[in-house]
């Protein structure tokens, strides 16, 4: 792919000119703020840059590039913004490099050499003779209509029969004749362009040579490639139409031409051949092929002869592109359509990738669900096997279990301790201190329940707050003496200590102290001598427990304090 500059009226492309003379730089698509600045500078309507869009280095100032070695490629600064766009137009207008300009210039030189083949009058003119051109042209304007057969009457006759006109012209009129020849050559060059544009406009988009507007609209399959190849022709032809290679005529030549026009329209048809006839009503080059001409004045007969001659000779494709102003606009519009189609194609590809990604995720989820279903199926099969294996023991188990699964009713004896029932979890973690131990924290889970008997069942299970490893364990029963508030707390611990504590319950507070303590023979020292516990339900509905103890080496000291939050009733 050949890299081309995306700026309007810029035909720089890769491989054109000297190496490293022009460098190309991509649009900053990832930097939105800088991209907006670039787009404002380029000033292209209905156009979106892609990763294949470039700007050449001629649109940037010298301070926009980073300092590098001479043999290294140019590198734009992160803040560089294009700002030079009018200089490129001046460059083309001054000396340019378009193929159409070379062709027109070559044609002018050919006509000049043909006009001055028999005599060297134009080459031997001095500066003093050139100064005489203006007064001589005025004399030519005041000449009588009887001399219409002379070269001054029909400029076409000058280009067709230069030898005869030079013989009939006196020597003192050499300078006006030379200037008239140059004017005829310029008018002939303009007439060629006007002839091509008028033939394209009169044919309504299709002339007798077989070239129509349909030639510029290829089938949809290769539209983008065709539009990309015609993009350079569009800009070059547009530049040629805006700035023709023929220099402007001086004011005196224009006056001479306007004076000659009414004379040549009436008498010079028979004397001038149709191949060299000139038109006096030029048509605007920017007119579209389908639009009607704005000038409705009748055309001279010379122009009619010229149109017949132009229809008889087929034109080349380059002349059609240069003359048909609507074709270039069509190419520009198709070029923007091409880029929009590419952009839509990239968006479709992106959407396809996202859909494929989502389909892959959905497939993995389905596989996980199928694996989970298979695991559930296996568990159900194992459960059925266990049920079948336990069938012989069902009559025996049914005799042990109660006939109904309803929870038992609370015994009225333990009603004063009903506020302790439920499952409790520590919140926050409990704190443990003792003079012979390092301070520590722990988590604890408490279950206090009943089975309808005049007692409560309890279990205390503590865990490490970080590793959640089991620590202290104890379980037992809480009994009340009927018709009193005396309470007995019987506990067995995993440290090998069994104790019986007794106390009283007052409202929602229970205080007990050790009555007897027993331990295994290999229990660790120092041995616990006395323990006190205090349970209290605070105003927030949380259960608090405080434990104090005395050993053989330490007096009664607070050992544990923890607060529980009720999880289940």
UniProtKB/Swiss-Prot annotation:
Give the span(s) annotated as Nitrobindin: 407-569
Compositional bias, Basic and acidic residues, is annotated for: 242-262
Which InterPro entries does this one have?
A: Calycin, Nitrobindin, THAP4-like_heme-bd, THAP_Znf, THAP_Znf_sf
| Ranges of compositional bias, category Polar residues | 121-130, 265-279
Compositionally skewed regions (Low complexity) per UniProt: 196-210, 280-289
Query: What is the uppermost EC class here?
Result: isomerase
Identify the cofactor(s): heme b
Sequence segments annotated as region (Disordered): 83-219, 235-312
Q: How is the cofactor bound?
A: Binds 1 heme b group per subunit, that coordinates a highly solvent-exposed Fe(III) atom.
Q: Which Gene Ontology BP annotations are present?
A: nitrate metabolic process; tyrosine metabolic process
Q: Where in the cell is it found?
A: Cytoplasm; Nucleus
Q: How does it assemble?
A: Homodimer.
Q: What is this protein called?
A: Peroxynitrite isomerase THAP4
